[in-house]
Amino acid sequence: MSKVYQVVVYHEISNQEKLAAYAELAGPAMKKAGAIFLARGIPYLVREDGVASRTVLIEWPSRQAADEGYNSASYQEAIRVLDGAAKREFRYMDAL
């Protein structure tokens, strides 16, 4: 099995308090499932048609681990706490 990289791009954040509460739950839930956080924050530089918005880069040991992490009860609870306070996009790619 190859590693998987997950890129999360935030398009809009409407409530910073809910985002902070989400992060307190989401980080440990994802780490428990095997996630390694590689980068998080606002890009220092964007090119072409890029938008400087909050971005997270995560490494997973496998597709299965990424799926199980997202679908875990603890991560789903984090999503409930987020309560729509962020519009974001998740992308998953197999490592080379």
Predicted feature residues:
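C-terminal structural segments of small proteins and small subunits
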Residues: 66-91
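Short S/T/G/P-rich N-terminal loop/turn motif that feeds into the first structured element of a domain
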Residues: 1-55, 61-71, 94-96
